Amino acid sequence: MEILLQKVYDQKNLSKAEMNIVATEIFEGRLSKTKIAAFLMALKVKGETAEEMAGIAEAMQQVAIQVDFPAGTAMDNCGTGGDKSNSFNISTTSAFVLAAAGIPVAKHGNRSISSRSGSADVCQELGIDINMRPEDMTYLLEKVGIAFLFAPHVHPNMKYVMDVRKELGTPTIFNLIGPLTNPVHLETQLMGIYRRDLIRQTAEVLGQLGRKRAVVLNGAGFMDEASLAGENHYALYESGEVHLYTLKPEEVGLASYPLEAIRGGDAKENAAILRSVLDGEPGAYLDTVLLNAGFGLFANGKVKTVKEGVDLARDLVRSGLAKQKLQDLITYQKEVLAK
């Protein structure tokens, strides 16, 4: 172990297997807080590689609470957060649109990172229980086609690094890998990231983690979501290859809006925004969800282009199917809790 730690201190890269060894030591509580802090900072200064990101993500999945679901059928659209945009809950709202398209969505999420309301906060405001048992999450995925997986609940071993991360007060590899650690074995994924320079690398990581198809994007204004404010940069992973692209909202039939147009509020305000979007209320909030759901449908392979995805997303909202998914989740969850 000391040899591997020293390797990083010497600014040398770890292999995926080596990182898995170090991460397992961390998640099993065998490394001191001092050593964890030194390791994370050395890694940050050196720069995290795709192999290192994949290694630590796999280690987290290995010690996570497992949620059983047929391998290779579900997707997630969780982002890293950390873009300081203070936007409303875009990926959470988009998840109901994806589920309405018949895609099982294992929505991995947490409390607020860069806004006043994280996905967990808004879910609670909507009446969604974020601390359900693994078997209940499986039931909801099978019955409704969407379930919320609260990150601290499914990753209890993160307690060994929580204090260290707070003490360091700076982004580390853990700020990048949250969306990579969904305990459900995903087939496809849409992942927003706040660092544009890591788009390609993160797409490669998703390939190493077994995704068949994935999109990693960084929006205009360096958002970890697709944005209507300008050019969006994204990477498509498929068949072992990564290709880079850009896309502006006008290319998919959407108007441009400044970032200020999608500002969010607290959990109560964001829950109201989410409901207004699923009701089809026109404006920047709805169009932002259509764009992100369009990317999600494209990442899943449900459509051949983002434009087709946006058009399908619009139909799913107009038909009321996306709104019905939210109601179904609340209804069936009550049924589970009543047992």
Swiss-Prot record:
GO cellular component: cytosol
UniProt: 5-phospho-alpha-D-ribose 1-diphosphate binding residues: 79, 82-83, 87, 89-92, 107-115, 119
First-tier enzyme category under EC: transferase
Reactions catalysed according to its record: N-(5-phospho-beta-D-ribosyl)anthranilate + diphosphate = 5-phospho-alpha-D-ribose 1-diphosphate + anthranilate
Protein purpose: Catalyzes the transfer of the phosphoribosyl group of 5-phosphorylribose-1-pyrophosphate (PRPP) to anthranilate to yield N-(5'-phosphoribosyl)-anthranilate (PRA).
The family this protein is said to belong to: Belongs to the anthranilate phosphoribosyltransferase family.
Protein name: Anthranilate phosphoribosyltransferase
Organism: Listeria innocua serovar 6a (strain ATCC BAA-680 / CLIP 11262)
